[in-house]
Amino acid sequence: MMTVSRWIDELKRQTIQADRWVRQRLEQFQPYRHYAVQPETWNSQYRGLEWDWLNDLDELSRYAMIAGYIRRLKPGGSVLDVGCGVGLLQQQLAGIYKRYLGIDISVESLKMARPRQDASTHFLVADAATFVPPYAVDTVVFNECLYYFEHPFEVVAHYRSFLKRQGLVIISMYHETTPTRIWTGLSQRFRLVDGIRLEHLTGKDWTVKVFTATGDNFV
């Protein structure tokens, strides 16, 4: 027999799913709108520890999945982590990569990440839309950041020339951000290698996909 607490949890989950379905249908008839956030807003939020919840246990699955893809497909390679924040993904990647470079537009977030810098791990303040990596990489990761760009497809395409041969792009997006339009555009432009949908018991869910930089359909 279902307990009251479990019934409430299930009701919450179904409500989230219904709300997401409505959002996705409405999105099909609306122009794409990115989440425009200024650097100082990011800095203020990180100073106020407003993003600390990203380190909660219910956020772990997407980080672990990205790390798993890199461990399986590009072990011992170089990683560019776009929008790295305080470097939570880097912690999951420790021991997997040869070189890691995390970039973020927030100075404050990188203050928290930089204590983990070493000879193979670096963090830089940069605008991802125009950043030029100092070396070619095996994998570029966009972990919950692509919907902050006004032109997300151009940003992904920007990094093509900085990927090594058979390099990969790994993208994670949370469903509450209604990224349907972005996923559709990516599938039309880039070659899919693999993908998975992750759902936590709280109702949070993400899609993580791996694209390859090779092929005529990569713009």
Where are these regions (language model features)?
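Conserved class I S-adenosyl-L-methionine
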Residues: 4-71, 76-85, 177
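Class I SAM-dependent methyltransferase SAM/SAH-binding core
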Residues: 86-130
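A short acidic, Gly/Pro-enriched loop at the edge of an enzyme's catalytic core
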Residues: 132-140
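A short SAM/SAH-binding and catalytic strip from SAM-dependent methyltransferases
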Residues: 139-151
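A short glycine-rich, Lys/Arg-flanked "PGG" loop and its adjoining helix->strand segment in the class I
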Residues: 155-165
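Conserved beta-strand signature within the Rossmann-like core of class I S-adenosyl-L-methionine
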Residues: 166-174
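Core SAM-dependent methyltransferase catalytic element
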Residues: 199-219
